[in-house]
Swiss-Prot record:
This is Colipase B. Colipase is a cofactor of pancreatic lipase. It allows the lipase to anchor itself to the lipid-water interface. Without colipase the enzyme is washed off by bile salts, which have an inhibitory effect on the lipase. Enterostatin has a biological activity as a satiety signal. Residues 1-13 form the signal peptide. GO terms for cellular component: extracellular region. Disulfide bonds join 30-41, 36-52, 40-74, 62-82, 76-100. Forms a 1:1 stoichiometric complex with pancreatic lipase. PANTHER family: COLIPASE. GO terms for biological process: digestion; lipid catabolic process; response to food. Coiled coil: none annotated. Its main location: secreted. Pfam families: Colipase (PF01114), Colipase_C (PF02740). Belongs to the colipase family. GO terms for molecular function: enzyme activator activity; lipase binding.
Amino acid sequence: LALLLVALAVAYAVPDPRGVIINLEAGEICMNSAQCKSECCHRESSLSLARCAAKASENSECSAWTLYGVYYKCPCERGLTCQVDKTLVGSIMNTNFGICFDAARSEE
């Protein structure tokens, strides 16, 4: 019995690599992209809860970087560029949307 209690105490003492506030998995509720493993805190509409989501892949809709850290369209995966016409109003309203493309491939 004592050995079982010690084993349980050790198991609970080991820190969980997934955090409550940071290092969140896809689908978990977030307030800022810095909290997500994927670095994208995404919301469907202004009334919905934001959740961690995967970054946009090639030829997918994307958002340019935003100060708010919450996106209606996730930024592109590493190595891709979000081709978007940035506007001041779009930056304020978080509506600067574009398409992810591979800049290295387009130069060839």
